[in-house]
Amino acid sequence: MKIEIKEVIDKREKEKVSKEVLYDLPEWFGLPESTKNYIIDSQDKPLLACYVNDEVAGYIVLNATSKDCADIFVMGVKKKFHRMGIGLKLNNAFEILAKKLGYTYSQVKTVKTGCYKEYDITNKFYIAMGYKELECFPTLWDEWNPSQIYIKYLGE
């Protein structure tokens, strides 16, 4: 099995990768308007895609929230590639890119643990990647989806 991480530059290819992954994950990305926004907004940001035997397996997008902090804007791994280390590889590549671009911190927002089993899996993943809970905003998105913010120090 050949696993490869590549930075995608072309906007049409970014759109294709985003659609292919997010449409495979309706349990996480089931709100059409939000999913559409992730697909459109990802086109102007650094995007890393993971390919398994030349098939898109997952992707991660970097968004700058400040001069010091890179945000995981969106990340997804197709279901058939879950539990194969794809998320770990994408996260590691994201951190390398963030440090190369001068960021010393990374943050990610997700739905707080205890709300939905799918997001409990997501929270466990980020904790396993070394992220720490920073703060929860109960109504940032809406009252049914409290926004948990995680942060990680990447180094100087």
Give each language-model segment a name.
Residues 3, 7-73, 78, 91, ...:
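Acetyl-CoA-dependent GNAT
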Residues 65, 111, 139:
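Flexible loop residues that form catalytic
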Residues 88, 112-136, 144:
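Conserved active-site alpha-helix within GNAT-family acetyltransferase domains
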Residues 64-73, 82, 101-104, 142, ...:
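A conserved beta-turn-beta hairpin within the catalytic core of GNAT-like acetyltransferases
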Residues 45, 145-149:
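Short hydrophobic/aromatic beta-strand or adjacent loop that forms the aromatic wall/cage
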Residues 98-117:
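Conserved GNAT acetyl-CoA-binding A-motif
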Residues 75-83, 112-114:
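A short, internal acetyl-CoA/4′-phosphopantetheine-binding micro-motif in the GNAT/acyltransferase core
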